[in-house]
C-alpha cells in the first residue's frame, strides 16, 4: 500500500514500485517475501511508513530487523518515515528503525517531525537522522538549499514541542484514546457492517465500507448523502477503494454526529 503523495518520486526520474502489506481481515503486516523480491529486482530505496498510515499498524522489531538484514544484503537504503511515532498509545511498542540493529544503522535514514503529534504542520520543519557514516556523509553532501525549506518559526516550535511538550502530548493521547474507543462503540452500535480495527497510534481510523454496497467509491457516496468527508481508500491504493480514512482527532460531539449522519444516509 502506498500513499499517492509519493508521486513526487517520479519527479526525481525514479520508478515507483508498490509492495503491498499482507492482509488478514484488518490486520496488516509487512510482506517480507515481497520485500525481498522487490529488493532482488533492483529496488534501491525503500520508503517505509513506520508506524503505518493509514492502516494503524506498528511494525514489529522482528520485521524491522529482517528488512534491515535484507537491505544490507541487496544494497538498499531504507527511509523510515516515523512522523506519527509520538502518538503511539500506551500498551503498544514503537521501535525506532535505527535502534534495531547495526544493519539498520548502516542502511537506514529516519525522517520525522513534530508536526503530526503537536499539530505544527503549517510551520514547516522536519528532521533527517541516520546512524551510519556512509549515509551521514551522503546527507551532509545535500545542497544547503534543502535546509532552507524549513522555516525559522517551525524550528523554534519543533524544539519547544519536543523539549517541553511531554505533558501536553500525554493529555492529547488520553483524549485520542477516548475518541478511538468512542468510535468503536458507535460503529458497533450504529454501523455494525463497517470494519474497524482500533489503531495502535494516532488519530486516523481505517474503515472498511465494502459490506454497505455504496458503489465504487463509498466515501464519495457518504459525502453526497450525509455530508461527511472521509479520505477515500483509493488515495492510498487502487485496491482499497472500498475503504476510508476517518479522522477522529476532534471532539466527541463531532465524531458522534459524523457516525449518525453515515448511519442515516444508508
Q: Which ranges hold each PLM region?
A:
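PLP-dependent enzyme catalytic core of the Aspartate aminotransferase-like
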Residues: 36-37, 104, 221-230, 236-266
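Conserved core segment of the aminotransferase class I/II
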Residues: 101-177, 186, 266
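Helix C-cap/helix->beta junction micro-motif
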Residues: 12, 73-74, 104, 226
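Active-site phosphate-binding strand-loop segment of PLP-dependent enzymes
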Residues: 21-92
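Short, small-residue-biased leader/transition segments that mark boundaries at the very start
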Residues: 1-2
Amino acid at each position: 500500500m502506498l500513499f499517492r503523495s509519493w508521486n513526487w518520486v517520479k519527479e526525481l526520474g525514479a520508478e515507483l514500485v508498490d509492495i503491498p502489506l499482507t492482509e488478514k481481515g484488518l490486520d496488516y503486516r509487512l510482506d517480507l517475501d515481497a520485500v525481498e523480491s522487490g529488493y532482488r529486482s533492483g529496488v534501491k530505496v525503500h520508503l517505509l511508513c513506520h508506524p503505518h498510515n493509514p492502516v494503524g499498524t506498528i511494525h514489529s522489531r522482528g520485521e524491522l530487523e529482517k528488512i534491515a538484514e535484507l537491505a544490507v544484503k541487496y544494497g538498499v537504503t531504507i527511509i523510515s518515515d516515523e512522523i506519527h511515532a509520538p502518538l503511539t498509545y500506551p500498551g503498544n511498542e514503537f521501535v525506532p528503525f535505527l535502534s534495531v540493529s547495526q544493519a539498520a544503522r548502516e542502511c537506514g535514514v529516519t525522517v520525522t517531525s513534530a508536526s503530526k503529534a503537536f499539530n505544527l504542520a503549517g510551520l514547516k520543519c522536519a528532521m533527517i537522522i541516520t546512524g551510519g557514516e556512509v549515509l551521514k556523509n551522503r546527507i551532509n553532501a545535500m545542497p544547503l538549499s534543502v535546509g532552507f525549506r524549513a522555516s525559522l518559526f517551525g524550528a523554534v516550535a519543533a524544539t519547544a514541542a519536543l523539549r517541553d511538550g511531554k505533558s501536553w502530548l500525554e493529555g492529547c493521547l488520553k483524549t485520542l484514546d477516548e475518541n478511538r474507543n468512542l468510535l468503536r462503540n458507535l460503529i458497533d452500535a450504529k454501523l455494525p457492517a463497517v470494519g474497524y480495527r482500533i489503531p495502535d497510534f494516532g488519530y486516523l481510523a481505517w474503515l472498511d465500507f465494502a459490506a454497505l454496497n455504496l458503489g465504487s467509491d463509498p466515501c464519495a457516496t457518504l459525502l453526497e448523502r450525509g455530508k461527511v468527508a472521509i479520505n477515500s481508500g483509493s488515495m492510498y491504493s487502487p485496491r482499497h477503494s472500498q475503504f476510508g480514512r476517518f479522522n477522529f482527532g476532534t471532539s466527541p460531539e463531532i465524531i458522534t454526529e459524523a457516525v449518525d449522519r453515515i448511519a442515516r444516509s444508508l
